Amino acid sequence: MIPGEIITKSTEVEINNHHPETVIEVENTGDRPIQVGSHFHFYEANAALDFEREMAYGKHLDIPAGAAVRFEPGDKKEVQLVEYAGKRKIFGFRGMVNGPIDESRVYRPTDENDEYAGVFGDNGAENVNKKGGKRS
């Protein structure tokens, strides 16, 4: 071993595995680009982003930590969201929650054929965030 050497596994790292997924269509109705980071509570994203906000409650983008999705003015794309894990408390952002997530408001798919997501896993579907949301 060489000092400072990093030895990694040759297997792929799965992120947000076994988290229910939701796919929504988002449109930037503003006149400036909007970027949303990986851990931002998507429900509280910029008001110029037009989407079904209630479906995004308690969720963040299903992308690697530190990454972001950019919406140019007029852009319309699908994004994949996953539920927050851990203590499920949200503070800051636009101040719309500031406390525990109200579980009764969290959208959860009812079956694998749900229009927006598969239940607990990708069921062979492709992560749409790599192109701009998840399609079977």
Curated annotation (Swiss-Prot):
Reaction catalysed by this enzyme: urea + 2 H2O + H(+) = hydrogencarbonate + 2 NH4(+)
Region of interest (Disordered), ranges: 113-136
Presence of the UniProt keyword Isomerase in the record: no
EC number: 3.5.1.5
One function term, GO molecular function aspect: urease activity
Keyword DNA repair: no
Domain of life assignment: Bacteria
Entry's Gene Ontology BP terms: urea catabolic process
InterPro entries registered for this protein in UniProt: Urease_beta-like (IPR002019), Urease_betasu_sf (IPR036461), Urease_subunit (IPR050069)
A single GO cellular-component term on record: urease complex
Disulfide-bonded cysteines: none
Subcellular location: Cytoplasm
This protein's UniProt keywords: Cytoplasm, Hydrolase
Classification via HAMAP family: Urease_beta (MF_01954)
PANTHER family: UREASE
Quaternary context: Heterotrimer of UreA (gamma), UreB (beta) and UreC (alpha) subunits. Three heterotrimers associate to form the active enzyme.
Name of the protein this chain belongs to: Urease subunit beta
